[in-house]
C-alpha cells in the first residue's frame, strides 16, 4: 500500500533538547489532534453545540461534523514549501520553493487561504459537486465564512481576496497543493458533511452563520492550543513502521488523547448550583427595591436581557449576583463573567465576587474556578 503524499509533511517540530521523543510530528496527525479536541468539545449534548445548532436550524450532529471537518484543515497552509523548509527533514523529501518563508507577509494561516484558492482555480476541488443546486457565489461566500474561523486559529482574521491569494502562490509550490488536495479528499471521507442541510443560499441564514462563527472561532483557538500540547499529543513520525501511516488508524488515538487533554483543563467539569433562597440569606441584609425585583422577576429558558440600573448604593452588584444565581440554579446558565472598564474596577469586583461565588456553586465536583483576566 502506497503512502499518501500528505504524510511527507511535518506540522510540529522539536524546539529544544528538553522535548522528549520524536523530532517532529506529521502535519496530518497534528490536524487530527486539533480536530479531535473540537470533536470532543462540541459534543452533541453540549450546551454550546445545542445553542449554535438551534441558531443555524441544523441538527447538532451536523454542526459537530462540520466543525470537525473544518478544524482538520486548520493548518492547510503548512503544506506550503516555504513553511516546510523552515525545518528540512531528509526522510520527508525536498520541497523546492521560489522564496523563503515570511511570517509577516505569508504566515501559514494566510497560506491556508492561498492553497484553498489554488485548489479551486486548478480544479482539484469541485464545490459544485457538494452544492449542485446553489449559486456558486453563495457557495464561495459560505466557504470564506467557514474558513474564517478555521484558518484564523491564531486569533486574527486573515485576508482572503484573490489578489492576496495569487501573490502568496510563490510561497506554496505545486507539490504542496497536490498533497493538500489529497488530504482534503481523505479528511472529507472521514468526516462527510451533509451540505444539502445548510441553507447557504438564504442570506439570513448566512448572516446567522457568520454570527455563530465568532463562537466557533474562539473554540478553534482553544482547540489548536490544546491540540498542540506535546506532553499529551506525542510526536509521531511513522519512520521505521511496517504499515504505512493512516488517518483512520490514528483517529481513535487522537480522540483518546483529546479526552485526556480536556480532563486536565477542568473547563468542562460539570458544576452544581446551590439553591437560591433570598438576598437576606445570601448577603445578610434586607433587600432594596432593585434587589427585591431581582429575587422575583420571571426567568425563562429562552434568551433574556436584564438591565439593572439604579442610584449609587442601591446594591446593583448584589442584585445582579442574585439574578445570576437564580438563572444558574434553574439550569439556564452554567457560569458568568463581569466586564468592567478598567483594571482597577476589575480588581475591586474580583475581590467582591471572590467572597460570594462559593455561595452560588457547590464544590462536590471540586473547586470552581474564578479568574481575573
Where are these regions (language model features)?
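Post-Walker A helix-loop "phosphate-sensing" segment adjacent to the P-loop in P-loop NTPases
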Residues: 326-334, 356-362
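Accessory nucleic-acid engagement/destabilization modules that flank
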Residues: 2-271
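Conserved Walker A/P-loop ATP-binding site and its immediately adjacent core
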Residues: 334-357, 370-373
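Conserved RecA-like helicase motor-core motifs
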Residues: 49, 359-373
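A short acidic (Asp/Glu
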Residues: 161-162, 321, 347-352
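Residue-level preference for the first positions of well-ordered beta-strands
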Residues: 66, 305-307, 335-337
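Walker A/P-loop
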Residues: 301-325
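Conserved pre-motif I regulatory segment
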Residues: 30, 271-309
Amino acid at each position: 500500500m502506497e503512502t499518501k503524499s500528505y504524510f511527507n509533511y511535518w506540522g510540529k517540530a522539536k524546539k529544544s533538547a528538553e522535548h522528549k521523543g520524536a523530532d517532529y510530528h506529521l502535519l496530518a496527525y497534528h490536524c487530527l489532534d486539533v480536530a479531535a479536541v473540537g470533536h470532543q468539545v462540541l459534543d452533541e449534548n453540549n450546551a454550546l453545540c445545542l445553542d449554535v445548532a438551534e441558531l443555524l436550524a441544523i441538527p447538532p450532529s451536523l454542526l459537530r461534523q462540520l466543525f470537525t471537518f473544518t478544524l482538520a484543515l486548520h493548518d492547510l497552509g503548512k503544506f506550503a514549501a516555504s513553511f516546510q523548509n523552515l525545518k528540512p527533514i531528509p526522510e520527508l523529501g525536498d520541497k523546492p520553493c521560489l522564496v523563503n518563508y515570511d511570517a509577516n507577509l505569508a504566515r501559514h494561516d494566510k497560506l491556508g487561504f492561498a492553497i484553498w484558492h489554488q485548489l479551486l482555480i486548478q480544479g482539484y476541488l469541485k464545490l459544485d459537486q457538494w452544492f449542485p443546486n446553489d449559486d456558486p457565489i453563495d457557495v464561495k461566500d459560505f466557504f470564506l465564512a467557514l474558513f474564517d474561523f478555521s484558518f484564523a486559529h491564531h486569533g486574527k482574521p486573515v485576508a482572503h481576496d484573490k489578489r492576496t491569494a495569487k501573490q502568496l502562490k510563490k510561497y506554496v509550490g505545486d507539490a504542496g497543493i497536490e498533497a493538500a488536495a489529497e488530504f482534503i479528499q481523505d479528511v472529507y471521507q472521514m468526516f462527510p458533511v451533509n451540505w444539502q442541510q445548510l441553507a447557504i443560499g438564504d442570506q439570513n441564514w448566512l448572516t446567522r452563520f457568520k454570527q455563530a462563527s465568532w463562537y466557533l472561532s474562539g473554540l478553534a483557538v482553544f482547540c489548536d492550543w490544546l491540540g498542540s500540547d506535546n506532553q499529551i499529543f506525542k510526536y509521531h513520525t511513522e519512520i521505521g513502521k511496517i504499515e504505512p501511516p493512516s488517518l483512520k488508524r490514528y483517529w481513535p488515538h487522537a480522540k483518546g488523547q483529546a479526552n485526556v487533554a480536556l480532563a486536565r483543563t477542568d473547563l468542562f467539569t460539570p458544576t452544581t448550583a446551590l439553591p437560591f433562597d433570598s438576598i437576606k440569606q445570601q448577603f445578610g441584609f434586607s433587600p432594596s427595591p432593585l434587589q427585591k425585583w431581582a429575587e422575583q422577576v420571571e426567568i425563562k429558558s429562552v434568551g433574556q436581557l436584564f438591565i439593572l440600573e439604579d442610584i449609587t448604593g442601591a446594591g446593583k452588584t448584589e442584585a445582579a449576583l442574585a439574578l445570576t444565581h437564580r438563572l444558574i440554579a434553574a439550569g439556564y446558565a452554567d457560569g458568568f463573567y463581569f466586564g468592567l472598564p478598567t483594571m482597577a474596577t476589575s480588581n475591586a469586583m474580583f475581590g467582591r465576587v471572590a467572597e460570594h461565588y462559593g455561595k452560588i456553586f457547590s464544590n462536590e465536583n471540586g473547586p470552581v474556578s474564578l479568574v481575573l483576566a
